[in-house]
């Protein structure tokens, strides 16, 4: 979890899965990434999969005009937290996955490929994240480890609440998607479970769209 503000929420979530593993993690701090790895090593000894679902950009970088909200600090923060953190975590966790048919997964969004109003710098970060997936797949492939991404349609989450006019984005998708609706967290989760499983053993370096056909 990121900080004390999220502790109760994450603890409750862990209990739903009968887990007592709740680890503080600021992905901008390499020491905390290493500490997370050591906790998991002590607890499990090995790892079959990992899901990266982390993204952040300062508010001024995800509203209004792209250039007006642009700054070196905001740009760097978005890339660090939303993109670099995935390969950084995979590198730290790799010793726990070597010798196993493991799989790593991240979450992205269409704003990496198309201009989405107010998504701005986060779209650039997601593009970097998707490129990282392809390079990870090439690096991990000889070890039998797969790397993929899920590009989900917009879902009401804590992170999404920071995007200006997010509700308009939801309604836009509902009106144009072939299924005439948004997707659910369960639908994204089901796809993640598939990609992490042996049923997806031939899939790596890919970006799977779960967006009601949008």
Predicted regions and their residues:
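C-terminal substrate-recognition "lid" of short-chain dehydrogenase/reductases
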Residues: 45, 181-210
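Short-chain dehydrogenase/reductase
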Residues: 1-73, 77, 90, 97, 133-134, 162, ...
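Short, small/polar-rich loop/turn modules that mediate ligand/substrate recognition or access, typified
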Residues: 141, 146, 203-205
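Short, flexible catalytic-loop segment of classical short-chain dehydrogenase/reductase
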Residues: 147, 151-162
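Catalytic loop of short-chain dehydrogenase/reductase
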Residues: 55-94, 98-142, 154-156, 175, ...
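Catalytic Tyr-x(3-8)-Lys segment
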Residues: 167-187
């Amino acid at each position: 979890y990121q900080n004390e503000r999220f502790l109760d929420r994450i603890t409750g979530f862990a209990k739903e899965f009968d887990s007592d593993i709740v680890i503080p993690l600021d992905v901008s701090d390499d020491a905390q990434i290493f500490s997370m790895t050591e906790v998991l090593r002590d607890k499990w000894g090995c790892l079959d999969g990992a899901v990266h679902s982390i993204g952040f950009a300062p508010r001024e970088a995800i509203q209004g005009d792209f250039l007006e909200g642009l700054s070196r600090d905001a740009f760097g923060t978005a890339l660090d937290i939303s993109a670099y953190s995935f390969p950084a975590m995979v590198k730290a966790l790799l010793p726990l996955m070597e010798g196993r048919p493991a799989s790593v997964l991240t979450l992205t969004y269409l704003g990496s490929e198309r201009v989405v109003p107010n998504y701005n710098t986060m779209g650039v970060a997601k593009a970097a994240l998707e490129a990282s997936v392809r390079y990870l797949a090439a690096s991990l492939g000889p070890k039998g480890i797969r790397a993929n991404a899920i590009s989900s349609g917009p879902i009401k989450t804590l992170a999404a609440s920071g995007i200006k006019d997010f509700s308009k984005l939801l309604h836009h998708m509902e009106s144009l998607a072939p299924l005439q609706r948004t997707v659910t967290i369960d639908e994204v989760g089901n796809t993640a479970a598939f990609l992490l499983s042996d049923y997806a053993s031939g899939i790596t370096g890919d970006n799977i769209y779960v967006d009601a056909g949008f």
